[in-house]
Amino acid sequence: MEKQIVFFSKEQQLSLPIEKIEKIIQWQQPIPIPETSSFVLGVIEHNKHVLPVIDLNARLYGTETVQHKEMKIIVVQWNDEFLGLSVESIKGIVDFGSTQFEWMDNEVTVEKNYIEKFIKTESGIVIQLNIDSLFEGNIMLDKLLRALETAKSDEEKTEEDFTINSEPVDETCQSK
């Protein structure tokens, strides 16, 4: 049995292995970031850190999610960083048996390598996503994560790091 979080995006059932998920949180409106990929909604504060939030509908289907009360943010780990995936709703944690999994035939290829496999259920087909491949090669997202990492390290700086000509800078940005 394999535990997965099943959720909806564009009314399609999608899933991620539970070990890839840090937490599921209530939807909150992200602060927009200029000049990022169209599927990056912005950032929120999560566990005292800045968390980029991705509109999964926009990433997968090219259409923005219409905001509503059932929306959630799934916090996942990608490339040693955390991302929030905005989804329409959460179906729940489901145990899938190995007989439910179906991989693609060698003759049939899925152009998008972020589809890990298909899962057959009584209510239809669930697409298991490969979170590691979902944003692979996205330069804008990589730059955003690097900028957030830099900002995180800037939080650790002390007053001594902010001097002009060896003089501390006061709160009005005037050298003393």
PLM regions: where:
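An acidic, low-aromatic, low-complexity terminal/linker signal
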Residues: 1-176
